[in-house]
Amino acid sequence: MTATPRMARYLEYSTQIYNIYLKYIAPEDIHVYSIDEVFLDVTQYLKTYGMTARELASRIATEILEKKGLTATAGIGTNLYLCKIAMDIVAKHMEPDDNGVRIAELDEISYRELLWDHRPLTDFWRVGGGYRKKLEAAGLYTMGDIARCSLGGEQDFYNEDFLYKM
């Protein structure tokens, strides 16, 4: 099956969804990553709305569904990396709620618990096939392996310098 690309329509939807974000978040707290992905820094809005990050994400996703007929996936984290990983690896692989929405949360502890042994490394943001091959050639197959490698001292084979030189 093939589909004709309709970029103008895609851009129109993207703009309309961005306008939904603006109902909740100021433009300086919306960081566009791509045409269909943004980072929202909602930290200062949670108290104002009296909501958790999950509740606010759910409200925004529900409005996107109601106004545009599109389901949304959200990743919530204590930093941008964890937000992205929560969305890319955890949320996209979980069962949706009744509205088709998927929301996953990660902090440093849950990242270790859920993803320390996750494979393949290419599922992680910014780890491409070439870098994966270099890491695996060095015996590093998981994020846990990489984290342990960074703990090595100057005299150890595995240490931070080893990673930087890859």
Cite the ranges covered by each PLM segment.
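Gly/Gly-Pro- and Ser/Thr-rich, intrinsically disordered tail segments characteristic of DNA damage-repair
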Residues: 1-166
